[in-house]
Amino acid sequence: MAGPSRRRRRLHLSKIYSYTCGKSSFQEDHSNIGGPGFSRVVYCNEPGSPAAERRNYAGNYVRSTKYTVASFFPKSLFEQFRRVANFYFLVTGILSLTDLSPYGAVSALLPLALVISATMVKEGIEDWRRKQQDIEVNNRKVKVHDGNGIFRQEEWRNLRVGDIVRVEKDEFFPADLLLLSSSYEDSVCYVETMNLDGETNLKVKQGLEATSSLLNQDSDFKDFRGVVRCEDPNVNLYVFVGTLALEEERFPLSIQQILLRDSKLRNTEYVYGAVVFTGHDTKVIQNSTDPPSKRSRIERTMDKIIYLMFGLVFLMSFVGSIIFGVETREDKVKNGRTERWYLKPDDADIFFDPERAPMAAIYHFFTATMLYSYFIPISLYVSIEIVKVLQSIFINRDIHMYYEETDKPAQARTSNLNEELGMVDTILSDKTGTLTCNSMEFIKCSIAGKAYGRGITEVERAMAVRSGGSPLVNEDLDVVVDQSGPKVKGFNFEDERVMNGNWVRQPEAAVLQKFFRLLAVCHTAIPETDEESGNVSYEAESPDEAAFVVAAREFGFEFFNRTQNGISFRELDLVSGEKVERVYRLLNVLEFNSTRKRMSVIVRDDDGKLLLLSKGADNVMFERLAKNGRQFEAKTQEHVNQYADAGLRTLVLAYREVDENEYIEFNKSFNEAKASVSEDREALIDEITDKMERDLILLGATAVEDKLQNGVPECIDKLAQAGIKIWVLTGDKMETAINIGFASSLLRQEMKQIIINLETPQIKSLEKSGGKDEIELASRESVVMQLQEGKALLAASGASSEAFALIIDGKSLTYALEDEIKKMFLDLATSCASVICCRSSPKQKALVTRLVKSGTGKTTLAIGDGANDVGMLQEADIGVGISGVEGMQAVMSSDIAIAQFRYLERLLLVHGHWCYSRIASMICYFFYKNITFGVTVFLYEAYTSFSGQPAYNDWFLSLFNVFFSSLPVIALGVFDQDVSARFCYKFPLLYQEGVQNILFSWKRIIGWMFNGFISALAIFFLCKESLKHQLFDPDGKTAGREILGGTMYTCVVWVVNLQMALSISYFTWVQHIVIWGSIAFWYIFLMIYGAMTPSFSTDAYMVFLEALAPAPSYWLTTLFVMIFALIPYFVYKSVQMRFFPKYHQMIQWIRYEGHSNDPEFVEMVRQRSIRPTTVGYTARRAASVRRSARFHDQIYKDLVGV
């Protein structure tokens, strides 16, 4: 144990500091505590006291498994039999135990048992893995106070509410803890929350001064007692309301004192904490809700096909039972027996009694439903699950979607939506971190009305290209750019006027100094000094913030240390010209949030002056300037607009001196608001800070570049050529979003922009003088009018409506999404080539996604990288998360994760198309083979006067779907490629086969079913007629049921497998093995099964070796049936490919006929793949060609005088 003196000698003050006061006062009403939602009471260090035990809080054992040992079988069986097909086979299996069954119970129940068992084994394995993870977590060890001043190792699962624990460096917190003290004197600790929100930057927590001063070592806890009264368990990770009672005093608690389970202690030797929430009451577990259940369109269509097949089965059973009942009633009795005596088993009179014909018909109905159950593909669901899992593995292991820089491959987090990737109609994309890198670089700034920095952004280059000029250069700049030295991450600034200390020679040096000081002081970054090199790096809450601190350092204002109440930095002194160290006392941090759109700090400089330093969005900051602080406003606004035009992210910087009395009053109100435990505490804090952040003096503005990711314009171009619509939903300013649209080729020069915003003079006037209701009414009317004008403009343009782009801001979007207006908005948006929604909130992103999904009825894909994109990702049919620098929340909420936007091209055009094509073909073929098999059963049943006698042996029936036809279908679903990846890129319109659902339309489904019916007719009638007069016995006996059934079954196995071989576009050795292996296995099985004793093999005893194999007619019949059964497919395919080829078939001809290197032939086909769209650089080049042609036409007309 370390005593307090030793601890203070070793670690006097932390290098990691909190920005809220550790000493809290309690002067606010706390009536919520003890009321609804705030009823939790924690007896610290007394978990076993009677008062604590009466509370009966949850233990710390966490179970993430779906099943327990006791519930596995009943619960998993219930899950399986919720599927209609499985329930149907269960019912038929139960009926097979009765006299109604046409076959043995074992052969009826075995296939169902195999399918159910396979799925249950899969469920069991997945749940066992979860169980192992639970065991590993629950058995972790942590030091727990035993009540006598000693901490002993204890497993996490045994923790109780009120326990005192000691967590050491790099350990995870075992529960939600109240931070009591740490190894640092100021009771702060550094916490990594990647497991909670995915963010990699470290968070700072600080205990109360009241506990940190009392609890310095293990022995101090022997007599420690305290009572926490706080909120009940909830999902809010960022808010905690409670109080701590120590002796006679109470202290307010906030999230700043709470250490959440599954976060990790970093850069701190140890902390002491009291357990507040355990197990499933912890915030991380409260947040671990299941993502929304998503099902693909193909799956939903498949369910309808299953219901159709059920209807067909019941219809056939009904018709057959009616016919059977009529024939039974008319069956005459002669000489003590009926005319159809040969149909009646000895012990089954009731089924064939002419006196009880209606009852016989009813019994036959149940027999027929069992007999025709083979129309329903019992193994379809499990086969599709296997295929989708294997497809997901291929996606995960695709080296072309692996991002080496961050070591991140693609990750299919769910396999349910693979085929949906090939059906996407609209992509809704975030901008920052998705289209751009979210790696900010300080590139320009405006100080005292003068622009600095001459770096050229990607957007400016795109603007120059589209205007036909040279890259934009600021006319005010006449400087020499110093290109020496290595490039600094986060800093891409070029301007010698302010670099290398030259700023001191500028006329506005005093303003420049204040500007750079603000960059060095107004932030929440943490400096970390490398002990070997002495270099300082920064841990910041956002890439923007890190870029500002790095920029300040490069300008000569190096922030190098932070204490609990101070910020230290080095700067060049204006008077002496030497580097000096300055320490500003940090008094308050007014934190940034999306509502305030600004952050400020209140500091006392080394001259004793109180300063408020603030930075924020231009629309928020300009309205807060004092009358005497607007000296550079017009010029700064102009520069901000220019920066936005260049696609840069801007912030405005301002400051003011604060009067001592004003600060005292503010600080009192501010601390009281922070100490409040009322529900409106955050609103109260915002109100108080709003009053302080007024009458500011403008210094200038910053501009940072978030560059487009590599390959974004090319990816967007290819997706546009595939016919996919792309919407951008961003929180950025309209000007920034528009110019990113140009840089990414979403927009181009000739595209007409329909801009909808509320920047009209009327609205601005009302915002200054009108009431809230009046503003809302005028705003709504303005949005409606602008939407109507946009629709009229589109209507007037006629067929060229794709040349329009819709751009709408967040305020207008609020009204456009209202129930009465949203259809008008959607109609306009879907008629435009590009849509950009600016200043969008996370909720608006989700609502727009929902509107597009429900309004168009087509597949939507949302892609984003931040926590603000989670709602959008979960609302879309497919959510794609970018594993970028904003953390992992988007990835954790997504269906598929990729590292770069450009990988979306391969994910959709290649994997999406392949998965769609494979699954569609697989399901169609499944129903084809089952109809082929089932119709032969029905025809034989009709041929035998609906006697209920099956055409095939029991085991033949049972094993058809399991062993003789399923593996080739699975191989098709995993390996087939109708078109190679190279041709998917070359002919992007191929993707429209999925969007238009060409390969799984009802026309194609019915066509495959009809093909199965034709195959069954050929098999049954050819087999029946060819064997009718054939002898299969030395005694002269003709073919019986076992001979006809064996021959028909052989033909079915050959036909369905050869049909599969004909349907495959891309053969692999696996497909050869499973197709020819399935056929060979039938003969092997027939020989082995037929060689078994007659009691087991029944009528199949020696049928192959003694009857079928020696008979030439068996082999000739099989050959001719195969040919005649497949001829209709050959004829159809030939006519269809000759006169009505699908697009993938045209591309296949290019490959098969050797035209892939014939430029003219390829260009002819490729032209069909290029849609007349204005999105993408291909469209831009085409427009350039058209402009050039018009230009030359005009010159020609001028020359000839036309």
From Swiss-Prot:
Keywords: ATP-binding, Cell membrane, Magnesium, Membrane, Metal-binding, Nucleotide-binding, Translocase, Transmembrane, Transmembrane helix. GO terms for cellular component: plasma membrane. The active site is at 430 (4-aspartylphosphate intermediate). It comes from the Eukaryota. Its EC number is 7.6.2.1. One of its GO terms (molecular function) is ATP binding. The keyword Cell membrane applies. InterPro entries: ATPase_P-typ_cyto_dom_N (IPR023299), ATPase_P-typ_P_site (IPR018303), ATPase_P-typ_TM_dom_sf (IPR023298), ATPase_P-typ_transduc_dom_A_sf (IPR008250), HAD-like_sf (IPR036412), HAD_sf (IPR023214), P-type_ATPase_IV (IPR006539), P-type_ATPase_N (IPR032631). The chain crosses the membrane at residues 74-95, 100-122, 306-327, 365-382, 921-940, 955-974, 1005-1027, 1041-1063, 1070-1090, 1108-1132. It holds the Pfam family PhoLip_ATPase_C. It catalyses: ATP + H2O + phospholipidSide 1 = ADP + phosphate + phospholipidSide 2. It is found in: Cell membrane. Residues 96-99, 328-364, 941-954, 1028-1040, 1091-1107 are extracellular. One of its GO terms (biological process) is protein localization involved in auxin polar transport. Residues 1-73, 123-305, 383-920, 975-1004, 1064-1069, 1133-1202 are cytoplasmic. Mg(2+) binds at residues 865, 869. It is an enzyme of class 7 (translocase). It is a multi-pass membrane protein. Involved in transport of phospholipids. Belongs to the cation transport ATPase (P-type) (TC 3.A.3) family. Type IV subfamily. PANTHER family: PHOSPHOLIPID-TRANSPORTING ATPASE 10, PROBABLE PHOSPHOLIPID-TRANSPORTING ATPASE. This is Phospholipid-transporting ATPase 10. The gene is ALA10.
